[in-house]
């Protein structure tokens, strides 16, 4: 994919990324202004002002001029779907995939590298990255991720890079991927604000979680969260933007009585403690319970998949965005959640955490093999 050697002279608008890059992607209503004539500049939304960046796209289009606008992926093959020199900002990613394997969303791995780093800042199965954490398509909409009809995957997180950006996909499955379509929109700019941070996304799973048993004397207390499920853990400074979570139930009854606990800057006690899993995802009362659960998908929170709720084999796909109040850290961050009250359940969890931070960052856990990533009921 060819690109200009130098971007056209431009000046990065201070508000373009700001301190919270994700807020730019979601859009924030303009605040009320004093009732004075003024120049009108403060009343104008950003999109009505002159734009100084260079708009570009890299895609899977047919270089011959034909209509074969896709890439096949053989088993074990890695395809570079994006490579650009900076400074720049990826503003939108769109994929759609045609593959015979029922779990190709779990088998294809997405990785992103910033500024020549050999370690990926994003490493996750492609479906999980787009909020399809159980490996099956489900149409939904949110501020930063969506799945459009019928199998279109979209991401609107802003991803700044100073020197370079590189994105790959790897087919770790046993079958050919017949067609991988890609469109990645980005902008070249003359410079980025000093406070611009790098986008990260980390996959984790517990298949299953280990249930903690208590004697009657313990009264099922969990003040320190030591056995909690861990969404992400990192060193450095930055802020958490949110998580997606898939749950496969291995037992009857409500699976979401666990509280979130967030540990900031090496604190041994959680700085943030919630009141239940459905509360963290901004729902309530067991999402409607065994016979009343109704899927929902809003800008900043959702449970876009709920099937066989509160039963063995029950399936949930959930998301929560913290763009209204990103969880900041200066030294470290560990985001966790109980699996059932005081970790008394052994359901399967599959999650991705999304955040921005400075470099360097802590190493990611080793990505589990495909067989372990595929959702399977595991009865105790």
For each predicted feature, which ranges?
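Helix N-cap and loop-to-helix transition residues
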Residues: 12-13, 125
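Domain-scale selection of a single, long terminal region
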Residues: 16-17
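N-terminal secretory signal peptides
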Residues: 1-11, 20-26
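Boundary at the C-terminal end of the N-terminal hydrophobic targeting segment
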Residues: 30-34
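Beta-strand-centric surfaces of beta-sandwich/beta-rich domains
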Residues: 35-380
